[in-house]
Amino acid sequence: MTGNPISVNGKSYAWPQAPLVVVCVDGSEPAYMDEAVAAGRMPWLAGVREKGTDRIADCVVPSFTNPNNISIVTGTPPSVHGISGNFFYDPTTGEEVMMNDPKLMRCDTLLAKFADAGAKVVVITAKDKLRRQLGNKLDGVCFSSEKADEATLKENGIEGVVEMVGMPVPLVYSAELSEFIFAAGVKIMERDRPDIMYLSTTDYIQHKHAPGSPVANDFYAMMDGYWAQLDALGCTVALTADHGMNAKHDPETGEVNVVYLQDLIDGWIGAGKARVILPITDPYVVHHGALGSYATVYLADETERATVTEKLSGLTGVREVLSNAEACDQFELPPERVGDLVVTGERHMTLGSSADKHDLSGLTEPLRSHGGPTEQRVPLIVNRAAPGLASDTPLRNFSIFDVALNFAEVPEQARGAAE
């Protein structure tokens, strides 16, 4: 262990003075914590808001899981790390590709770099889809609760996870998938005292339940209890989210609010002349039906761009239509992994491809989803004061390691607990 600052992707990060636990609460619109605290369900967080750092940050757009988790662990926007969504279209091969492969990443993670310098690093995700990218080049522990029973020393740096935690492997579509992460995190912190731990949950609850609802408050109360345990173990606990979440349905009928872009564009310029890609698409579509508030459009004929842009811009529920250059400049995206046009939806509107391509039968509650700038505001909270961090400093969710390592003040007793 060096104890010296580490330079990663052009930025210097101080060595952790106490065990650092960074938590990405998937889909955590700020109102979830606000409502749970107001209801008295998060006493630990209520105390942290008094003594620690409590800010609002902007996530990456598209406000989806993969680009934001990779931004958080690299400290960079997608223009640097290359992950532009959960899913993208490669025009050179004509294939639509899940963005789960570490080969698609263009820079190293803080996690791998700290481990290379001697830090003990642990990564636990809910869904296995993220594990390989978060663990890219990482010499440490990295496993998912989804496949915790399959973890091996060779592949994951740990074995016997289920026995250690004392919980069965949860269903993918459950609150317990996220709880398993925290239960495992506490056990590992007690046993091994890693220097850095990254915990990334699933947004199953947020997709189904609004802020302040009984189920949502129960979920946040559960997390609050585990965070309190990590705090009591002397950890610096830093919280953020990959994106927010909004209702995307008619409040009267519960019907999904959606504009099917592929159907419309085909009607305007003819079938086969455009391809609509929805970067929210991932292997776990039951809770969102692959409907979010961000889409990208590839055009076979560049001369159609003005027509398609004008028509899309006039649609009710469409927030903005940007060219590739405009979108990549505004959202800091890699141009070659974005279409000719980027379309974002209004707060309560989703964007689909063709109506017959979306199976909404799994939506047991009115749709809540994300993807656009209207889901960009997320919490950034640390259980330490950061007096050197100016109150007007604009923050991103991928500022969380910077704030926690370079600005948060660790008390002497916590430093002692880290030894």
PLM features: what roles do these ranges have?
Residues 1-53:
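Active-site-proximal N-terminal segment of extracellular/periplasmic enzymes that hydrolyze or transfer
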Residues 18, 25, 55, 63-64, ...:
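Secreted, luminal/periplasmic, and some membrane-associated catalytic domains
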Residues 180-181, 221-223:
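Active-site glycine-rich loop that binds ribose-phosphate moieties when present
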Residues 344-409:
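Low-complexity, glycine/alanine/valine/leucine- and proline-rich hydrophobic stretches
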